[in-house]
């Protein structure tokens, strides 16, 4: 499990971008999308700081919306920069994973 | 810990770091409501989460801050020997209004000595100190009177600076509140105060009367973590108000936010 | 003037909170008084004034030592050195006079008719005048209270043991109590005793005040390496 946490730490922000590529969302729902995608439970303590970083870097845009029921929620969506980063970083990641797979193959 | 307690603690921790808590607390509250998890499981301890939020928000690039005008404190060529041991060897120090200098160095590298020389309490063997304004000094310990109450200290030091009684008390008390010491007015003789609280008094007395130059020698001895953070918040606050501040410190966490670092360890570049 | 008064006020507050010192101040001279009361009553007068002199100078020693920690900060805050020691002296003199008054009344009542009341008053006033500068001078010269206490103890012991007729005895700070005391208790004694006593007290006072002023000014002096822009 520890190794997995370390792997996730390296790509969490890209995964968040990926989750938002499917449409805008708010914190808890993003966590659910990631969990449904097989990444396991993402703690709020990890997710929200990552969202703040992405927002600061301009890769996501956020706004508060008052819901019909309940209090206001902060919604996030990909910015143009975010979409571009997701595409290029995603490509780099694919290459990286390919290389790692090749090295780890037992001959 | 209940969610409400956790959220209240988070709010306090964020406020202490001068972050508006509304956004992060609102989001965390919504998350906990949606998921129904235990807050410590979902987010961890409030202080740790607050740190993570700050890290996420903090601007990575330091503000470039040029010196403005004549330095309020300029020490040149300060040399001090104790017998055969040379404690300070030609040290220079310049501090301008609105600038914070951190003075670091190993134990015995002469940090306290340098500060006392700049405060005028000790004579160097050679060198000169030029002051452009009033000075306030806070030693590592001492500087208070066992049998007087904090209020009486405020009046005593205030009178020296020409501040009236009521005004001096008011200023001292408000500074105490900023350092998380709300019941300073009701405190008894200072010999009954805990070490950390007494140091708060020491710090307040150094700052009373609004001196232009502040010389602080590790004034946070005995402070709990919250007060330590409050202290640094006050330092940034005083910097914004145009004070020239020198802080002797061992602890390196705040160094990326000060304007200049002076390292007194022998052999290091100044 | 105002700053000196603030120093004096705070020094008074400090002393009033030191219960042990206050009790000693109040009761030790009483013990001295009654130690000689059985024999020659005139010894009581001398001993009670020595008791007051000793406890008041010890109180001054403690006050002066305790102030060392805060005095540099007060200098930085803008006090002149003379305001610091004059304020402290004013507080100690006030305490001394408050202390001496009940003892004066005690002697008045107890030794009614046997002594010259005005001379007694003079002895007590002069003792109160000399003791604080003595204590502060010792504090200024000796940084630690223990050494200071030993010095004061030695002085008081010598004061009691040395034959007052010897010239050496005049070097002791409270010699004048014996001199004026002679006039107070001996009906045949001339007023020249008073003159000599006053002169001695005056000189002692000046010497100790000078020591306090010089030592404190030296310790808290504005250093030459600092200049104001």
Protein language model features and the residues they cover:
Chain B
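The feature captures the beta-strand-to-loop junction immediately N-terminal to the Walker
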Residues: 104-106
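Helix-to-loop junction immediately C-terminal to a conserved catalytic motif
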Residues: 119
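Q-loop/switch helix immediately C-terminal to the Walker
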Residues: 146-161, 171
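Conserved ABC ATPase "signature" region
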Residues: 155, 167-185
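Conserved ABC ATPase signature
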Residues: 189-196
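Catalytic Walker B motif of ABC-type/P-loop ATPase nucleotide-binding domains
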Residues: 214-218
């Amino acid at each position: 499990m520890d190794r997995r946490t370390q792997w996730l730490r390296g790509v969490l922000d890209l995964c968040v971008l990926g989750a938002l590529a499917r449409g805008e969302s708010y914190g808890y729902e993003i966590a659910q999308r990631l969990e449904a995608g097989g990444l396991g439970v993402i703690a709020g303590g990890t997710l929200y700081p990552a969202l703040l970083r992405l927002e600061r870097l301009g890769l996501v845009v956020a706004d508060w919306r008052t819901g019909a029921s309940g209090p206001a929620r902060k919604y996030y969506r990909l910015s143009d920069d975010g979409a571009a980063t997701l595409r290029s970083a995603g490509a780099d990641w694919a290459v990286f994973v390919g290389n790692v797979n090749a090295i780890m193959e037992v001959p | 810990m209940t969610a409400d307690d956790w959220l209240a603690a988070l709010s306090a921790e964020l406020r202490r770091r001068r972050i508006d808590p509304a956004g992060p607390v609102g989001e965390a509250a919504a998350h906990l409501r949606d998921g129904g998890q235990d807050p410590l499981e979902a987010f961890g301890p409030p202080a740790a989460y607050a740190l993570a939020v700050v890290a996420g928000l903090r601007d990575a690039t330091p503000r470039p801050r040029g010196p403005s005008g004549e330095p309020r404190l300029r020490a040149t060529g300060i040399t001090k020997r104790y017998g055969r041991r040379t404690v300070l060897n030609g040290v220079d120090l310049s501090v301008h209004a609105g600038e914070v200098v951190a003075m670091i160095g190993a134990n015995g590298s002469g940090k306290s000595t340098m500060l006392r020389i700049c405060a005028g309490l000790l004579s160097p063997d050679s060198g000169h100190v030029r002051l452009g304004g009033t000075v306030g000094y806070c030693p590592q310990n001492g500087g208070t009177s066992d049998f007087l109450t904090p209020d009486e200290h405020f009046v005593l030091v205030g009178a020296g600076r020409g501040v009236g009684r009521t005004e001096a008390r008011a200023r001292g008390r408000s500074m105490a509140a900023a350092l998380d010491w709300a019941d300073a007015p009701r405190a008894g003789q200072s010999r009954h105060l805990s070490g950390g609280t007494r140091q708060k008094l020491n710090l307040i007395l150094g700052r009373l009367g609004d001196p232009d130059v502040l010389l602080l020698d590790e004034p946070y001895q005995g402070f709990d973590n919250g007060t330590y953070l409050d202290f640094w918040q006050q330092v940034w606050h005083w910097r914004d108000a145009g004070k020239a501040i020198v802080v002797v410190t061992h602890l390196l966490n705040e160094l990326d936010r000060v304007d200049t670092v002076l390292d007194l360890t022998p052999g290091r570049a100044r | 003037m105002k700053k000196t008064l603030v120093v004096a006020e705070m020094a008074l507050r400090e002393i009033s909170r030191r219960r042990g010192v206050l009790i000693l101040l109040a009761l030790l001279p009483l013990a001295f008084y009654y130690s000689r009361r059985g024999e020659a009553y005139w010894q009581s007068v001398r001993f009670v004034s020595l008791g007051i002199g000793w406890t008041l100078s010890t109180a001054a020693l403690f006050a002066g030592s305790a102030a060392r920690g805060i005095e540099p900060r007060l200098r930085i805050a803008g006090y002149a050195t003379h305001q610091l020691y004059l304020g402290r002296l004013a507080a100690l003199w006030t305490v001394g006079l408050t202390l001496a008054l009940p003892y004066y009344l005690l002697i008045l009542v107890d030794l009614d008719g046997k002594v010259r009341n005005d001379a007694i008053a003079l002895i007590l006033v002069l003792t109160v005048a000399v003791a604080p500068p003595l204590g502060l001078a010792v504090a200024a010269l000796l940084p630690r209270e223990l050494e200071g206490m030993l010095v004061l103890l030695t002085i008081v012991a010598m004061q009691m043991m040395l034959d007052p007729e010897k010239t050496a005895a005049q070097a002791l700070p409270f010699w004048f109590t014996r001199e004026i005391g002679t006039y107070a208790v001996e009906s045949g004694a001339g007023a020249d005793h008073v003159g000599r006593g006053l002169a001695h007290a005056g000189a002692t006072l000046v010497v100790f005040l000078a020591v306090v002023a010089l030592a404190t000014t030296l310790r808290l002096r504005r250093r030459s390496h600092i200049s104001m822009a």
